[in-house]
Regions:
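Short, acidic, small-residue-rich periplasmic hinge/interaction motif at the N-terminus
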Residues: 25, 37-41, 71-75, 85-136
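Short strand-turn segments of transmembrane beta-barrel domains in outer membranes
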Residues: 217-220, 229-264, 275
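Extracytoplasmic beta-strand/coil segments of soluble accessory domains associated
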Residues: 144-187
Length: 805
């Protein structure tokens, strides 16, 4: 199959145009410059940007010579002229510049994690960028597919679509991204990152322009979590000129996707509107029929005004997301999975997530002087979700039934029964309302003193968030294969169903980037003052009186970090860093709870090598946990939301990434490779009620952290035709802490997934592509939680038409 695909791709290469290919690098360090703009003078429609390796390519049909302008923030603009015989594999060097950033540039900079010029090669620590060019290659909807190329980042698949991802970094917990800082445009985007960090909302990946991931000491100024790292979703930017672009996709399993963006800018304002409509029928088949897909709608508006002089700018961002997904926590028994992995029991027919998310941010920039600017952002996020899903059958939890615990055999039979007695099924309305809001301000100053250059940042954030938990359960019976309600529940009634979790957090950070000759140092610290509270009204459903149970906790923590890089020679850099890791606990679900925060000491050592068209980065990391923190969410255990201290843990590993661009016989072969090795073990013994840990012994391996992950991508390009093949391997992964041999009963399957995309550029404005996800139709167990065994997505064909006018 693979040989046939390559032969077809090579045959198609006969249709091509002239190609102008190059790389943009820093003239002083030899390192690639990311997202540099390449524009053909005299033609606004012919242009591109460099990817994370500094590569770019342009189709320049019928041109004997070309004059281009290359721009990048923090660099002097360069204009170059090239003759046709020199179109192939050129290197363009840009000089670093102390050019003053405009307020509009500052707006863009403060929404990013990658600093001036989006150039992570300047950062003395681990920072990965998935650039605009790379995002457009596959144009994925599933965030798991997007970030799988980044070493040191772990994903636990759940629904096959990435609707509610589980992401961790360098051995941190994966559960609902609760141990990382999930951000959009530099603003915390998890529904309640302090009071209830498990994120049941994730921004839609396909509407994003690029993605940034920070790990190690390079992410110290982002809180509250610093043990893992930060992921920043970078939303669509306001275009410089009048523009209308979009993509329409159709595919198997009822997939229909439409994305449109339009906008423009003038000297004093900019405006952009984007919509993303995503609908899928689902790939799982419910016994007796039913919908297993989803319908998701996204709308984004950005408006900017700025002064004539380079003094001030103000940007408004408003977004709205709606989701209705027929997703469940109910998996399969091993026997049923082996017989039909994409089956769903009829008892999950009513399962449905109904969610709405609204965000508003207002960001203002003032240039106080040529080397001092102040940026302030007010943000407000509202999120409501009600995940109505099967909780128990005949009094047994769905987890115990699918684990086939003693006494649950009759309940298992009811999962696919045609008729039952009344009240056989407990379907719970997991109804929550979240709010997070705050004001964050950053002062940035550039100056020189005693032979050293400084970029000093001082920031503070006043933040509050809450999660209002007001749940209930309805009881059903099965009547001729259809669920019929028999006993409606009372809203808020039941243990721990009538609660409010709140958090107030004030944080301050200071960070100085110091450059002395070939040495770049970053020294910083972050201070967090956090107040957490949990109120439980119990049976007082109207909350007319003081809560019957109130639990509070206060935390004050200082999180320092230090990183340094040294430019050994042109294109070769080494770096190291150390920082304190921290993750706050909640107030506890019971009055007697006394949960300690997560604390660790984290080290990294790495090197970067860049020469010609290939780049390599190698990093080793060592995270020494004084105390690990776990939480029993419904996604990982029984859903008590109790937190557990896991004591000492040692997580160490290696991250390797490599990119190259090969030109041969008029064909281009872009290639990238990443590898992650992780060793994660408990360093003390203890007993816990947290299912994934259980009774732990020294040197037990942590669950859901694969030892080895590999990602590779190979492209073939010539003129109007591009095709890319990507491969992802994930080792068998332990599902419960332990040291015993991995089997189907205590681990996921090893996963080897291949995706293919082929694109044809019809003309300057139109392109067509054809994608195959999971080319070999590999069928594996990706998880045994929340309840039962769960499959990956089967092979799927998708076609798309993209336009840009």
């Amino acid at each position: 199959m693979l040989k046939q695909i390559i032969l077809v791709s090579l045959t198609l290469q006969t249709l091509y145009a002239n190609k102008f290919l190059g790389k943009v690098i820093d003239s002083k360090t030899g390192m690639p410059i990311i997202e540099a703009n390449i524009q053909v003078n005299g033609s606004e429609q012919i242009g591109t940007i460099t990817n994370k390796s500094g590569f770019f390519s342009l189709s320049v049909t019928n041109l004997d010579n070309i004059n281009i302008k290359v721009t990048a923030i923090g660099y002097t603009t360069a204009e170059k002229n090239f003759e046709k015989q020199n179109f192939d594999m050129v290197t363009i060097k840009l000089n670093q510049s102390a050019v003053e950033l405009s307020p509009i540039d500052v707006l863009a900079e403060r929404s990013r994690l990658s600093g001036t010029g989006h150039n992570y090669y300047r950062v003395p620590g681990s920072l990965s960028l998935i650039s605009k060019a790379e995002v457009l290659e596959f144009n994925d909807t599933d965030i798991n597919r997007v970030i799988s190329q980044v070493p040191g980042v772990y994903m636990q698949e759940e629904d096959g679509y990435g609707l509610r991802p589980n992401i961790g970094m360098r051995g941190s917990g994966l559960e609902r991204c609760a141990k990382i800082n999930m951000m959009e445009d530099g603003v915390l985007i998890a529904p309640a990152p302090y009071s209830s960090p498990a994120a049941y909302y994730s921004p839609t990946a396909r509407r994003m322009e690029s993605f940034e991931i920070r790990k190690g000491s390079s992410q110290i100024k982002y809180g509250p979590h610093s043990t893992g790292g930060a992921i920043n979703y970078v939303s669509a930017s306001i275009p410089q000129h009048l523009d209308f672009q979009g993509t329409i996709s159709i595919g198997e399993y009822g997939t229909r996707i439409a994305k449109f963006k339009t906008g423009m800018s003038s000297s004093n304002y900019g405006l952009m509107f984007q919509t993303h409509l995503d609908n899928a029928g689902g790939f799982k088949k419910i016994d007796g029929g039913g919908d297993s897909g989803y319908d998701k709608k996204d709308f984004l508006l950005k408006a900017r005004i700025n002064t004539d002089s380079d003094f001030a700018a103000l940007e408004l961002k408003v977004s709205h997301t709606e989701e209705l997904s027929h997703e469940t926590y109910l998996g399969l028994t091993m026997a049923d999975f082996e017989e039909s992995p994409y089956r769903r029991y009829s008892a999950s027919k009513k399962d449905q997530m109904d969610a709405d998310h609204d965000q508003i941010t207002v960001t203002g920039v003032v240039k106080v002087s040529s080397n001092l600017d102040i940026t302030s952002t007010y943000y407000n996020n509202d999120f409501h979700r009600n995940w109505y899903k099967l909780n128990k059958v005949n009094g047994h939890s769905i987890g115990s039934i699918l684990d086939q615990d003693e006494g649950t055999a009759d309940s298992y039979e009811l999962l696919s029964a045609e008729n039952t007695e009344n009240d056989a099924y407990d379907i719970k309305a997991n109804n929550r309302i979240y709010n997070s809001k705050g004001l964050q301000t950053v002062l940035n100053s550039d100056f020189s003193i005693i032979g050293s250059k400084h970029n000093l940042m001082f920031g503070f954030r006043q933040h509050s968030d809450e999660m209002d938990r007001f749940q209930w359960s309805d009881l059903y019976k099965m009547n001729n294969g259809e669920l019929v309600i028999t006993t409606p529940g009372t809203k808020g009634e039941g243990g721990k169903n009538n609660r409010l979790y709140t958090a107030q957090a004030n944080s301050v950070f200071i960070e100085d980037e110091i450059k002395i000759n070939q040495v770049l140092m970053t020294v910083g610290t972050r201070y967090e003052s956090i107040s957490l509270e949990r109120k439980d009204w119990g049976d007082d459903l109207n909350r007319d009186s003081t809560a019957s149970s109130i639990k509070s906790a206060d935390l004050n923590v200082l999180v320092p970090g230090f990183g340094v890089s040294y430019q050994l020679m042109d294109g070769i850099q080494i770096f190291t860093g150390v920082h304190n890791g921290f993750s706050p606990p909640g107030p506890g679900i019971d009055d007697e709870d006394d949960i300690l925060p997560e604390e660790s000491l984290n080290f990294e050592l790495g090197s970067r090598f860049n020469s010609g068209f290939h780049s390599t980065e190698l990093v080793v990391f060592y995270n020494d946990y004084k105390n690990l923190l776990g939480e029993d969410t419904e996604a990982t255990g029984s859903g008590t939301y109790a937190q557990f201290n896991g004591g000492k843990v040692l997580i160490q590993g290696l991250e390797l990434s490599y990119t190259n661009l090969i030109s041969f016989s008029g064909l281009l072969f872009p290639f990238s490779f990443s590898y992650t090795f992780t060793d994660a073990k408990f360093k003390n013994s203890f007993d816990s009620d947290f299912g994934p840990w259980g009774n732990v012994s020294i040197d037990d391996e942590l669950p859901y952290i694969p030892k080895t992950m590999i990602h590779a991508r190979l492209g073939i390009e010539k003129g109007k035709i591009k095709s890319y093949l990507r491969f992802k391997h994930v080792d068998k992964t332990r599902t419960v802490a332990g040291q015993n041999t991995l089997t189907k009963l205590n681990s996921t399957d090893a996963s080897n997934i291949i995706d293919l995309v082929a694109q044809y550029q019809l003309n300057t404005n139109l392109s067509f592509n054809f994608k195959v996800y999971n080319l070999t139709d590999s069928r594996v167990i990706v998880s045994s939680r929340p309840a039962g065994y769960r499959p990956n997505m089967p092979r799927q064909f998708v076609t798309s038409l993209t336009f840009d006018f």
